Design a protein with these regions (language model features):
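Pyridoxal 5′-phosphate
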Residues: 1-134
Length: 134
């Protein structure tokens, strides 16, 4: 039997991507990523993984926080602020281990449906959570 749900889903995804302006999407992601990057820049112990320029990271921001367990931080962000992030190795265990980042990272991702307000909310809650846990 064919994988009809997968075929229909792929067709819907292609239609969706054809309707959006990818350059506009990229500009939006970078703009939101800059808000996050700037918002966490002054927090003691926070280190950005990857290029400093948000344009080189598109919609992804990965962070380590000295003295904080990223899994605990993710739970606090969710429970205290309704902010959903990922924590851990993000399917690249070897990359983290080769750099001795044994705790993994906290990762945010933004997309077309995210807003500047949501990104500012993240940076506020993130700052509070880091201060509470470190």
């Amino acid at each position: 039997l064919g994988h009809y749900a997968g075929i229909a889903g792929t067709g819907a995804a292609i239609e969706y991507l054809n309707r959006i302006d990818l350059a506009e999407l990229q500009e939006h992601e970078v703009s939101l990523n800059r808000i996050i990057t700037d918002g966490v820049a002054g927090i003691s112990g926070v280190e950005l993984i990857g290029p400093a320029d948000a344009a080189a990271r598109a919609g992804i921001t990965a962070l380590t926080v000295e003295g904080c367990d990223v899994h605990d931080l993710a739970i606090v962000l969710d429970e205290a602020g309704g902010v959903m992030v990922r924590s851990g190795y993000h399917c690249v265990n070897g990359w983290f281990q080769a750099r001795n980042l044994m705790a993994g990272s906290l990762r945010t991702s933004v997309y077309l449906y995210n807003t500047e307000e949501e990104c500012r909310h993240f940076t506020d809650i993130f700052s509070d959570a880091v201060n509470a846990l470190s």
